[in-house]
């Protein structure tokens, strides 16, 4: 889920609704959507980081040891950042791809934000173009205990298969085994992805990519976990210890 504006009205995702801020997303999930977990993908913006710090001070939300922010003892919020990387295509030209980067704690995403400000011209805005590749980005994500998931991988212009490469493994090379899952996006489904041999041992997730409150949970995942936390959700995405993705909707 994207953030349109900070609590004090600063723009984050220009194309997203102004009502789409951190607190409103949490409330929408709790009051209307009936979901247990939401990933908010613009949390590396310093404006959003400030909103999260203030949100935690309200007493309605708290961080947990296994990662994530629990809101009203029910909703687990996973902090994330969507980063646009610059890739070299097979023909030598350059393409751009989006990457979902998820982190267990506010401290981790603050560290990630500080480091990425060296590679992104305006870190306050959503999904800005960086001067690094996915191959380089995954090391920075792991430095701050995060997980990288290639975003909407078939979408034209801003994805790996849509704009950068015929093989994802060509981009990540020896680090390809660190990619546990890919996001399908609105332009594809599991039947299409299953036709690509290099994705045979990767798991698929579907997210709403919501740009407004009503669009939250337009697409979603059903997971089998022991409890709700960043650690458990990542186990499900990796299919570890009996945790797993049950379905994409």
Cite the ranges covered by each PLM segment.
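Short, charged, surface-exposed secondary-structure boundary motifs
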Residues: 89, 110-112, 214-218, 232-238
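Flexible inter-domain linker/hinge segments
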Residues: 225-249
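Acidic/histidine-rich helix-loop elements
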Residues: 2-19
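Divalent metal-dependent hydrolysis catalytic cores, especially in the metallo-beta-lactamase
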Residues: 26-48, 147-149
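Extended substrate/RNA-proximal surfaces in nucleic-acid metabolism proteins
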Residues: 7, 47-180
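Histidine-centered catalytic micro-motifs
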Residues: 1-5, 43, 206-211
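Acidic/histidine-rich catalytic cores of soluble enzymes
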Residues: 182-191
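Short acidic/histidine-rich active-site segments
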Residues: 202-218
